[in-house]
Amino acid sequence: MFNGFRNIGKKLSTEGNDTQQENKTNVSATPTSDKERARKKLLKVTGIISAILVVIFIVILLGTILIGRNYTYDQVEQILKNAAVKYYQVQDVLLPTNEGEKSEVDATTLASEDYKLMKPLAKLKKNVSCAGKVVVQKINNEYIYTPYLDCGKSYKTEELYKSVISKNKVVTNGNGLYEMNGEHVFRGDKVNNYVKLSKGLFRIVKITSDNKILLIPALEEYYSDVWDDRYNLDMGYSSGINLYRPSRMRDMLANIYSDKLKDFSLLADVDRQKLTTFSFCIGKRSAEEENNTGAVECADSLDNQMIGLLSASDYINGSTDANCKNTVSKSCQNYNYLKIKNTAWWLGTAASFDTNDVYYVNEDGYLLYSNASSLNIIRPTLMLNNNVMIRSGKGTESDPFILK
């Protein structure tokens, strides 16, 4: 009897355990099923989104292939330039042969069936009619390629000199751009003539009669040296000789231009491609001279130079002070953007009254002369070619002209 009760109790206990286990199984099974369904639903949604994105990509790709890509103006100019380089590799007999000479090829020729070096401009720029060409010029035994794009009112490649003149109204007094001796000359102490090159800021001194642009460093960094330190027979010691052609300064400027100095760098290769040769005026001048047209200094000059120094007349013309007349006038320090306070720097003009003195801008900002063997800062001048294009900028120190 007791055994019967035990068996019944064991059976009830076992059934109770089975019921509890079943309840546990049912409770734990429900969340697992929900997670699985959610995972499958997420995968399905992800798959649908991925499929939609693939379809969109294919549609865009097909549209690009069938309709053609709409390039930016800068990209079109680069396409023009690259095509012209390939063109002249084939037609090298058409390249300019002499220094300064130019040759050009238009976009129609580059895109023609004969060459197929680029797509027609109509397929590169949509909803705008454009004409284009590339001018190649031989400068310092290198070929410089300049693309021109004219899309009417929408866009037009603009040379820097044109932009400078358009942004700086010609004035006859005060700060600004003046017409002097057939050139456009910046004068005054507050002028918007900053240009950004790879190594720093430069100032535009003037735009020449053939639209080239004379630059001088704003002098963020500098290098000092003698103008010349040779033995001078007239003076009886190594005071230097004030003739530019055989001077130490000429050698130093060549090293600066070629970037051969270890602790000073003025230019990058991309900057040199924008420069052109010029006549460097090296004529001597008296302290009392009042002719500031450049005729005195340019009575003697070196042609085909890539680097030089500022002339005395160019510095004098930078001042708007009416009393700045002769070479050593102290008034030339007034209203003159070329002045750098507490900084003395060499000019390219030598004194005409002896064989050892050269003019320099002293720490106060007016001209004095000293032995060529003196130590002063070198502030080189460079000439931007007239085909250099502007990318942006207003010419201010904070927003300088940026070149293409």
Task: Provide a role label for each language-model segment.
Residues M1-T32:
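N-terminal targeting leaders characterized by basic, low-complexity, disordered sequences
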Residues F2-G4, L124-E158, S374, I378, ...:
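Short, surface-exposed interaction loops/tails
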Residues E36-V54:
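N-terminal Sec-pathway targeting helices
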Residues V54-I65:
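Hydrophobic alpha-helical membrane-insertion segments, chiefly the h-region
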Residues G63-S103:
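Conserved hydrophobic/amphipathic alpha-helical signal-anchor segments
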Residues A83-V90, E113-K116, I207, A218, ...:
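Structured segments of extracytoplasmic/periplasmic soluble domains
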Residues P96-K133, L253, A299:
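Extracellular/periplasmic head regions of type IV pilus-like filament subunits
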Residues S154-K404:
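Collagenous Gly-X-Y triple-helix signature in extracellular proteins
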